[in-house]
């Protein structure tokens, strides 16, 4: 049974700095909205590589973004060593910049926390909370650079970027 606004599943393969990143996106918007969003994600990825000088080594040889932007989705985001999963009830056409902010934040974690992290976070316990007095520092750097990357990539103006702090 089809419902109003039933989405078409879309996937695009993009390349940033000759390094493949696969985007899978589930939304109920247009192909033009998807292409704009994927292009902006590519700008974020490219700017992050500029900050760190290179891509980290991905065990799978690529990085995958999986996003679910539907009215029925809950808002959440989580990075992993080789991928990021994002969800939001916001549509690409109305929440574009906010959704990109989550992408930028989570992708910065590819370096900061996934590969550079306080010792108190190790070893990871995937069955319980990992309390750490230093996590605020890792998240603080990620919040700062996530917003700065959007501005450097031309996706947010300086006034709005400074207002976030």
Q: What are the residue ranges of the model-derived segments?
A:
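Extended, low-hydrophobicity, Ser/Thr/Pro/Gly-biased non-transmembrane segments
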Residues: 1-9
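Acidic/His/Gly-enriched intrinsically disordered linker/tail segments
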Residues: 8-11, 116-124, 129-165
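Juxtacatalytic substrate-recognition/specificity segment
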Residues: 11-134
